[in-house]
């Protein structure tokens, strides 16, 4: 098969590493690293400087200059095989719907949605058109999450009872500088606004939408103080933004109940000083996995008394034999390509599924279930942290759907 022709919509920080100084190559860079499979033929962004940067990167990789446009609807008529969407969060769904209606397979960047109705629109559009849509939750492909999932699937963890995860990432400078869309999000909403990095791998482990589902959640928010303190203490922002009131609480915690009896704990912590952490933990009847300490604790191998706890710190490499083959074969160049290699692997699998017409590794039903947590958490917080029912976006099909792990396809 010839190379897939790709249309790329959204070429800012995440899309093309616009304005980044840390060596990031963005999603576009990782697509170009998979150049045996694809060629980017059309690019779209509202800003000409982003288009110019992306075009230079594509030409530097040895490809012809792509068609440029500022209107995403032009991309739908450019004779492409797939669309990659890395716009602002609020544009994801409408662009994806446009692509699906045009019969063009879509890869949509992650983020929540403030509207459960948007999730239903994605599901309904897929069921009407059967156009594939892939939710680009790269953390499902990360080495740690891949290992935890493999340990569960091999039975080493026993029956999974509880998982927790977090998105802990100090983004105060991003928000205050207004370099992207986060400023308006934090000003206007209070919710679990970025759930899927931690929730996606957990949902896969717990077979959500394939034998299990979320039934209800409850969210609670702390007060909002971190951004105000940061802005007032920074001369660059104090005069212009000192009086801005942010709706978003500094720490949002969410508990999710699953139909099969498991529970999930999520934490959003993005406007206080801290180090980056996703903090995946998996608690099963035979074992425990902790991403933060890179620990695997299995029944019978360790004295579970607390005084022995540190003996298991940083021992997960002892279980490397259980990693998927992609992680056993990965090169240093691929690891450096973005987010420790998971972006490269994610696109490799997406392009292979397109070429071989396989089901998407993270499909529309999973996307809807995970994204809806943002809107549902917002509702719970606004109503005094009451439990909120979670929709079944499969309309009952979850009872017979088969579990598909991302490394299975």
Explain the meaning of each model-derived region.
Residues 81-82, 88-141, 155:
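Beta-strand-loop-alpha-helix segment that lines the small-molecule cofactor/substrate pocket
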Residues 263-276:
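Glycine-rich phosphate/pyrophosphate-binding beta-alpha loops
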């Amino acid at each position: 098969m010839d190379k897939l022709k790709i249309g790329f919509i959204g070429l800012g920080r995440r899309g093309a590493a616009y304005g980044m100084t840390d060596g990031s190559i963005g999603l576009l860079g990782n697509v170009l690293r998979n150049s045996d499979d694809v060629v980017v033929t059309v690019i779209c962004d509202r800003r000409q400087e982003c288009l110019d940067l992306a075009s230079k990167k594509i030409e530097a990789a040895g490809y012809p200059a792509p068609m440029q446009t500022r209107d995403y609807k032009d991309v739908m008529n450019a004779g492409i095989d797939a669309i990659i969407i890395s716009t602002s969060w609020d544009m994801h769904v409408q662009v994806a719907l446009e692509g699906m209606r045009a019969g063009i397979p879509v890869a949509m960047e992650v983020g929540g949605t403030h509207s459960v109705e948007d999730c239903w629109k994605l599901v309904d559009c897929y069921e009407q058109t059967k156009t594939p849509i892939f939710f680009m939750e790269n953390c499902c492909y990360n080495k740690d999450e891949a290992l935890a999932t493999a340990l569960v699937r091999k039975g080493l963890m026993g029956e999974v009872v509880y998982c927790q995860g977090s998105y802990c990432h100090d983004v105060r400078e991003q928000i205050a500088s207004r370099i992207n869309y986060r400023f308006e999000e934090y000003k206007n909403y209070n919710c679990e606004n970025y759930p899927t990095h931690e929730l996606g791998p957990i949902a896969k482990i717990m077979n959500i939408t394939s034998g299990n589902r979320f039934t209800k959640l409850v969210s609670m928010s702390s007060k909002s103080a971190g951004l105000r303190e940061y802005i007032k203490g920074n001369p660059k922002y104090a005069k212009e933004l000192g009086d801005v009131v942010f709706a978003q609480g500094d720490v949002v915690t969410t508990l999710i109940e699953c139909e099969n009896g498991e529970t999930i704990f999520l934490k959003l912590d993005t406007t206080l000083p801290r180090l980056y952490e996703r903090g995946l933990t998996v608690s099963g009847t035979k074992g425990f996995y902790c991403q933060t300490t890179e620990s695997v604790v299995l029944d019978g191998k360790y004295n579970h008394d607390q005084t022995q706890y540190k003996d298991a710190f940083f021992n997960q490499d002892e279980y490397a034999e259980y990693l998927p083959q992609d992680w056993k074969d990965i090169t240093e160049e691929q690891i450096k390509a973005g987010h420790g290699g998971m972006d490269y692997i994610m696109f490799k699998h997406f392009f292979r599924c397109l070429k071989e017409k396989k089901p998407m590794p993270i499909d529309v039903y999973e996307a809807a279930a995970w994204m809806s947590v943002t809107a549902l958490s917002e509702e719970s917080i606004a109503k005094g942290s009451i439990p909120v029912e979670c929709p079944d976006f499969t309309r009952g099909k979850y009872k017979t759907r088969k579990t598909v792990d991302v490394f299975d396809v």
